[in-house]
Amino acid sequence: MFDALFAKYDRLVIFDTETTGLLFNRDEIIEFAAVVVEQVNGVPTVIREYDQLVSLSPGGFVPPQIEELTGITTQDIREKGLPKTRVCRDIAEMVQGNTLLLAYNAQFDLSFLFYMLLRDGDPAILKGKDKLDLLTVYRDRRGYPHKLCSAIEAYGLSDKVVNSHRAVDDVLATVAVMEEMEKERPDLDRYINLFGYIPKYGVEGKPIGSVTYKPQPYNAKQPLYI
C-alpha cells in the first residue's frame, strides 16, 4: 500500500491541529497530533504517534465555542500543555529527511503550523517538504459535503474511527480514510503539492509557495490533476 508514495519518500507524516479559531495569524494551535509512517520490510508501519496539548500565549484562553467543540479547556492547556518551543522541536524531529506532509484540509493546518513555527520555532523545517491534501482528493472522489466526518461515513469507517474534533482522533481517522482512498484508486501521488479550492471562497489563508492551487467545484467531473 502507498507504493507510489514510498517510491518517492522515506516517511509520511499525517497530522492534524485543533486551534482557538480560524485566523491563522491571530489564533493559536492548542493541540497537535501526528502519525509517522515508514516502510518496514516493505510494509507501511506506524513508527510513532504524537499527541500534545500546546500552551497558550500569555493572556490566551480557549473560547467557549472551541471548548464545546473540542472538549479542551483553558485549564487543560494550563495543566497539560507543552511550551510551543518544545512542540516545534518535536515537529522538526518528525519531519526531518525525505518526508511527505499530509492532512485533511492541509491548507488550514499548514497555515497555523507555519505561523507557530515562525513565532516559536524554525519555519525553514517546512521548506522543500512536499504536501498532500486529502480534502482535495476527497472532493474528486465524492460529491458535497466534504467534511472529514463525510469521508468517514462514505468509506464505511464509522465503527472504526471518529471525527471528534480532537486532533489525535482526527489524525487517526485521516489515516483510515487515506487507506480507503488508496484502495479505491491508487493515484494519491498525483495530488502532491496540488490543492483544490472552492472558487466562491478562493484560497483560505496564506498561499504556500510550493503548492499549485486550482479551482475545484463541489461536484468534480474529473480529477483535479488532469
Describe the residue ranges of each PLM region.
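Short, glycine/acidic-enriched loop or turn micro-motifs at the edges of active sites
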Residues: T19-G21, T136, A173
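Acidic donor-binding loop at a coil-to-helix junction in glycosyltransferase catalytic cores
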Residues: V168-D169
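A structural signal for well-ordered alpha-helical segments within the folded catalytic domains
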Residues: H146, L172-V175
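Buried hydrophobic packing segments
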Residues: L113, V137, T174-M178
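Short alpha-helix plus adjacent loop in nuclease-associated cores
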Residues: D130-H146
